[in-house]
From Swiss-Prot:
The keyword Cell membrane does not apply. Residues 75-86 have a biased composition (Polar residues). Pyridoxal 5'-phosphate binds at L166, T167, F194, P195, S196, D197, D278, H281, Y303, W337, N365. It is found in: Cytoplasm. SUPFAM superfamilies: PLP-dependent transferases. It comes from Pyricularia oryzae (strain 70-15 / ATCC MYA-4617 / FGSC 8958). Transmembrane segments: none annotated. It comes from the Eukaryota. This is Kynureninase. Pathway: Amino-acid degradation; L-kynurenine degradation; L-alanine and anthranilate from L-kynurenine: step 1/1; Cofactor biosynthesis; NAD(+) biosynthesis; quinolinate from L-kynurenine: step 2/3.
Length: 497
C-alpha cells in the first residue's frame, strides 16, 4: 500500500529559509531537478495557453499541436513541459487545484473501459471483472475506491463510503449524528463556511424545529482572519452543555487556515460533543488520520486535490464504533438498498440488512462513470504518499510565500511615502503547520478582476473569490517550483503595472 512506502522528500526546517538567488527562474528549475516526486507531473494533462482560449470542441487534447497529433497518436511535446513559445504546446500555469484538479491521463482509459464494458455485456457488468480492465465489477467499484482512499484519509476501508456529493453526504451524516434535544441543540461552526455548508447547517437546525439565532454558534476570526485553536477550545468549553455537534472545515476554504483537527476533536469529544469535519479542502492536501483522531464522521469531495473531475462522486467517513449493525449498536440513518449487505442485496427482501461500517449509509447505486473517474484519480494519487506530497507542499507553499513577500518589499521600496495601501497581503497563516497548499492573497480593493485578467492573459490560472481574494494553490502532485515562479512573476507584473 502507498502508506507503507519509504518517504522520499525531506521535511523543511522551521522557519523555512531560501537563498539570495531564490527569486530567479534558474533557482526554481534547479529545485525541480532535485525533486524526488517530480515524475508525478507526467501523469496529468495540462491545459495549454492555446487550449484555454478554445471556443468549441475540436477533438484534440491540450499539448497536441494542430496538424500534428490527435489522442492516441504520438506527439513531440511532453505534456506539462515546453521549450518553445508556441501557445499550442506551452502549458498553462495551473494553480487552481483547490477548486478543480487537473485531469489524470488515466481517466480516459478508465472511462473508456467502463463504456466498453457497458456496450459489450450490458447488465452483466454489475458482476463481471475482466483481468485486463482497470475496473472491478460495477457492484464492487465503490468498495474498491474506498479501499484506495484508506491511506488518503487515515481510516480502514470499512469506515469509508463512496457516494453522492459532499452536501448530500453532509445531510445524510447529520441525519444520524445531529440529534438535538432541548438541552443539547447547538452546532458550533465557523463564520464563513463554504455556502453550501451554511445552507445545510441552517436547514438542519430548522428541520428539527430550532432557530439558528439560538442554535448556531459561529467562530469569528481576528483582524487577520485567523481563528486560534485557543479560541475554538474556549468556545467549546463555553457551550459544552448545550452543544450537540461541532462541525468545522479541516481547512477553511477562503483563508486557507488548517485547523488542529486531532486536538479539537479530542477536546470536543471529552465534553460529550459529536465531531464532524468537512474535508473538502483537506483531503488529498494534508495527511489525515481520521480513525486515530477518533472523529465521529467526515465528508469530502474528490474533484480538488484528488483530481476525480468536476462534480465527482464524494466520500464519507464513519468511525467504526458507529458502524455496528447489531440491534444494540445500530446507528439510525436514512437508508436505501445499496446500503444493504451485498450478499443479500439482490434478494430484494423487505427488511433492511445493513452493510457493516460506513457503507451501510450508501443509499443508491453509485454512478459507474463517476467511480471509474475516481478510481483513475486514486490510482495516480497512490503512486506516492500523503507524507511525501505534504513535504513537497511545505516547500512549494513556502517558496510562493517567499516570492510574494518579495513583491511587497519591492513595492514598499518604490512607493515609500505615497500613502497607498500595499497591493495585497497574505491572510493564510505563515506557520507551515497551519496551512495546506493554498495561500489566500487579499488584494487591495478593486484589484481582483484587473489582476486576475492580466494573469489569465499570461496563461496563469488562479481562483478568484469576490470581492478581493485570489487563492494561489501550488499542488504538489503536479505543480513545480518553476510553476510557482511563473505564477508569482505574473502576479508581480499585474500589480506593479
Amino acid at each position: 500500500m502507498a502508506a507503507t512506502q519509504k518517504s522520499l522528500c525531506a521535511i523543511p526546517a522551521d522557519p523555512i529559509e531560501f537563498p539570495a538567488d531564490a527569486n530567479t527562474l534558474d533557482y526554481a528549475r534547479s529545485e525541480d531537478a532535485k525533486c524526488p516526486i517530480r515524475h508525478m507531473r507526467e501523469h496529468f494533462i495540462f491545459p495549454t495557453r492555446a487550449s484555454l482560449k478554445k471556443k468549441a470542441l475540436d477533438g484534440r487534447l491540450p499539448a497536441y499541436p494542430p496538424n500534428h497529433a490527435k489522442p492516441g497518436e504520438t506527439a513531440t511535446a511532453q505534456n506539462g513541459t515546453s521549450n518553445t513559445n508556441d501557445d499550442n504546446v506551452t502549458p498553462a500555469v495551473y494553480f487552481c487545484g483547490n477548486s478543480l484538479g487537473l485531469q489524470p491521463k488515466a481517466t480516459r482509459d478508465h472511462i473508456n473501459a467502463q463504456l466498453e464494458t457497458w456496450a459489450s455485456i450490458g447488465v452483466h457488468g454489475h458482476f463481471t471483472s475482466w483481468d485486463n480492465s482497470p475496473l472491478k465489477s460495477w457492484q464492487d467499484m465503490a468498495a474498491d475506491c474506498a479501499a484506495q482512499s484508506a491511506s488518503v484519509v487515515g481510516a480502514s476501508p470499512d469506515e469509508i463510503a463512496i457516494m453522492n456529493t459532499l452536501t448530500a453526504n453532509l445531510h445524510f451524516m447529520m441525519a444520524s449524528f445531529y440529534r438535538p434535544t432541548e438541552k443539547r441543540h447547538k452546532i458550533i461552526s465557523e463564520w464563513k463556511p463554504f455556502p453550501s455548508d451554511t445552507y445545510a447547517i441552517a436547514s438542519q437546525i430548522q428541520w428539527h424545529g430550532f432557530d439558528t439565532a439560538t442554535s448556531l454558534v459561529e467562530l469569528h476570526p481576528d483582524e487577520n482572519y485567523y481563528i486560534s485553536t485557543e479560541k475554538i477550545l474556549a468556545t467549546i468549553d463555553e457551550h459544552a452543555e448545550s452543544t450537540a455537534l461541532l462541525l468545522l472545515p479541516g481547512i477553511q476554504y477562503w483563508s486557507g487556515q488548517l485547523f488542529d483537527m486531532p486536538l479539537i476533536t479530542a477536546h470536543a469529544r471529552a465534553k460529550g460533543i459529536v465531531v464532524g469535519w468537512d474535508l473538502a479542502h483537506a483531503v488529498g492536501n494534508v495527511p489525515l488520520s481520521l480513525h486515530d483522531w477518533d472523529v465521529d464522521f467526515a465528508i469530502w469531495c474528490t474533484y480538488k486535490y484528488l483530481n476525480a473531475g468536476p462534480g465527482a462522486i464524494a466520500g464519507a467517513f464513519v468511525h467504526e464504533r458507529h458502524g455496528k449493525v447489531d440491534s444494540d449498536g445500530f446507528k439510525l440513518r436514512l437508508s436505501g438498498w445499496y446500503g444493504n449487505n451485498k450478499a443479500t442485496r439482490f434478494n430484494m427482501a423487505k427488511d433492511f440488512d445493513p452493510t457493516p461500517g460506513a457503507q451501510g449509509w450508501v443509499v443508491s447505486n453509485p454512478s459507474g462513470i463517476d467511480l471509474a473517474s475516481l478510481g483513475a484519480a486514486l490510482s495516480v494519487y497512490n503512486l506516492t504518499t500523503p507524507a511525501d506530497l505534504r513535504k513537497k507542499s511545505l516547500w512549494l507553499t513556502a517558496y510562493a510565500e517567499h516570492l510574494l513577500n518579495g513583491i511587497l518589499k519591492d513595492e514598499a521600496a518604490s512607493s515609500a511615502g505615497d500613502g497607498k495601501k500595499p497591493a495585497f497581503r497574505i491572510i493564510t497563516p505563515s506557520n507551515k503547520n497551519e496551512r495546506g497548499a493554498q495561500l489566500s492573497v487579499l488584494l487591495r480593493e478593486g484589484l481582483l478582476d484587473v489582476v486576475g485578467e492580466k494573469m489569465e492573459a499570461a496563461g496563469v490560472v488562479c481562483d478568484r473569490r469576490k470581492p478581493d481574494v485570489m487563492r494561489v494553490a501550488p499542488v504538489p502532485m503536479y505543480n513545480s517550483y518553476e510553476d510557482v515562479w511563473r505564477c508569482v512573476d505574473a502576479l508581480r507584473k499585474a500589480v506593479m503595472s
